[in-house]
Amino acid sequence: MTPRSIRMAGFIAGFFVVVFWAAPGATTSATLVPHRGIYSIGLERAEAGSGVVGVEGAMIYKFTEGCDGWTVENQTLMRFDYEEGRSLDSSWSYVSWESKDGLRYRFRVNQTRNGKPGEMFRGTATTPGDGGAGQAHFSQPSRFEVTLPPGTVFPTRHLLALIEAGRSGGLNFNRFMFDGTSPDNPYEVNAVITPLRGAVSGQAAKGPLPEFQLHIQYRDDGIAEALLQDYGDITLKLHLSKVEALSRPEC
């Protein structure tokens, strides 16, 4: 089994999300708190055939706000321990900037494995603002373009819309989202929202299986307190161990 990347506000793959929301029924508009969070990473579960016996690591997630956009920085370090004593060190970094009007997006992704360069993606994306199709331009690892389906949004606006759905009592949320973390973008994200941990119905089993399932426990200010990433053969757990509020700009 190869190492997986932990991605927040840089979600991957046409996947299924279960959101545990702290404050359904709120009437004010969703806002995100600029912050820097440190998450511990560990192995929640591993099937016998996965070959994985242990995972440990940390993720540093930084969300900042400017007058015209948001910046997300994610740096993840993980060590995978395998049967027969093998191990692998993996690092993954992601930096993005997204305009508040939802029209422009820049991204940069780097991965290393045992210190050797791995995947690298860089590029920009735009949407027309009228709900029509957008366009993504990758400059690395090679130059190519991807058409974004009508209604595609970028990560921060996707998170804001997800929070709005949770606060208004919505139970299901489905939308295309582009984050630039792989050439397979954009991804169709299917979310089920519940105010109670563990109160998940059997809906996840219907239809095509997603690449993985992501369970997120959010605070009312949009900060994730705990996450589970279930890839089928292994499940990784993340817990918020430290959070620091950051200032907002005076615009």
Task: Place the predicted regions along the sequence by residue.
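Hydrophobic/aromatic-rich structural module bridging two neighboring secondary-structure elements via a short loop
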Residues: 74-126
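Short beta-strand micro-motifs enriched in acidic
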Residues: 62-66, 97-99, 126, 217-219
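Mature, soluble, non-transmembrane domains
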Residues: 108-251
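N-terminal secretory signal peptides that target proteins for export/translocation
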Residues: 1-6
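Short, hydrophobic/aromatic-rich segments at coil-to-beta transitions
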Residues: 31-40, 68-73, 102-108, 188-191, ...
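N-terminal cleavable signal peptides for secretion/export
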Residues: 25-87
